Amino acid sequence: MESLSLPVLNPLLASGSNLFRNQHSRMTSSMVSSLKSPIGGTSLSTVRRFGVGVVRMQAVDEDIDLKQMRDIAAAKKRWDGLLREGKVKLLTPREAGYAISLSNKPLLDVRPSSERNKAWIKGSTWVPIFDNDDNLDAGTLSKKVTSFAMGGWWSGAPTLSFNRLFLSKVEEKFPKDSELIVACQKGLRSLAACELLYNAGYENLFWVQGGLESAQDEDLVTEGVQPLKLAGIGGFSEFLGWTDQQRAQAAKEGWGYRLVYTARLFGVVLAADALFVGAQQLGHYIQELRGH
């Protein structure tokens, strides 16, 4: 378990965090440039000390980004090694479906609850390696606000935290000589789970390449309120139907499916227009009140 190094809980949050740091660096550098000449009672030595402090903050941010990149690269290298050396066997979604239906191999679903609750494989066992972080402490709230501001409102990607009970929960359900098919939505978290399980003594592991999202309708027997391909989307992009998964679904479903999202788009445009007109009218009303 200690060999797994996953500093980033989800890719969107990582990209949002980097964007935030870049904006922070630009803002602080502009502050330094504006303080090059002393203003009021501020001494030149104070400005220089402040500038040095900002430079150090930027250096720390860059070091964090570099460490994250190195850790991710190292993790991918380890995961590739597991597959290359045959320690974890690779299955396509169709092969996984055959193994489940013909050989009764268990499927371990390691997706977070936000994805699992939408669609799942019939008869699968659910133990998330990362799950939605519902804590209300200051650190978690800060992460959620940052994630939302940096694109979470559009993609609907939740804030996730590592499930420290993952291994113990799996060990409760499956002996270590079990043949386990491990799957997630896109394939990355399930590889991380395979590494944890292999290091814990599970040696008959099968990884679903591309995740459940890459499965065709006939590959696996599913249950839930949505198609399996749509379980990983969310946010405003899902509401408008502007995701690759929904476009692929629309190509199969036809115009009736597209009409729903077209109507939603028109509704959003009309609502935005009404808000704009209402704001203008309110502004005129306030000006008239001030004139009297």
Curated annotation (Swiss-Prot):
The gene is STR11. This is Rhodanese-like domain-containing protein 11, chloroplastic. Its main location: plastid. It is found in: Plastid, Chloroplast. Pfam families: Rhodanese. SUPFAM superfamilies: Rhodanese/Cell cycle control phosphatase. The active site is at C184 (cysteine persulfide intermediate). Residues 101-224 form the Rhodanese domain. One of its GO terms (cellular component) is cytosol. Keywords: Chloroplast, Plastid, Transit peptide. Transmembrane segments: none annotated. Residues 1-56 form a transit peptide. InterPro entries: Rhodanese-like_dom, Rhodanese-like_dom_sf, STR11-like. The keyword Oxidoreductase does not apply. CDD domains: RHOD (cd00158).
